């Protein structure tokens, strides 16, 4: 007669301990992996504002600069053409375009231009504009005094708005031989959707955006 193999109590306890240790190791490994992934995601989010700050501070990658006033030296005789480009990222139902596609200005001349934005949705939507200039070597010389890109924009259903940009090209660009022969600068904006917009009350008289601009 054949006999089925039997397992002693000690062997059974040892087997259960082995299974328990295996499960414990799996849980530990899963926890470590989850922690590493969370750390990497957090680091990637932290890198975005740092990268934006670095670009604004240095003009890297064609990022323009922020100025508080007109240049002390005033405009110079050299002229340059400035083209205006507009884009809207997927997921934001806006129509966005410059009122002028190109203008000619003196270097150092403070100039105001307008972009027109229309919310084509039947709901309130919000967006934030990213920007750069081309060629990339001009980023540190393109100075903005006022720009809709500085803040998040919230639009009511069907709302149409004119958004100003006040800028100048720093006269010191004339001393940069890397930009000798430069005749045209392209200023480009892309509006991206904001999922959780900050609700701000509309100030009295804010409707006329052309008042009070340089």
Curated annotation (Swiss-Prot):
Name used for this protein in its record: Cytochrome c oxidase assembly protein CtaG
Entry keyword set: Cell inner membrane, Cell membrane, Copper, Membrane, Signal-anchor, Transmembrane, Transmembrane helix
Pfam families: CtaG_Cox11 (PF04442)
InterPro entries (alphabetical): CtaG/Cox11_dom_sf (IPR023471), Cyt_c_oxidase_assmbl_CtaG (IPR007533)
Keyword Ligase annotated: no
Alphabetized Gene3D superfamilies for the sequence: Ctag/Cox11
Side Periplasmic, residues: 52-214
UniProt keyword annotation of Membrane present: yes
SUPFAM superfamilies: Ctag/Cox11 (SSF110111)
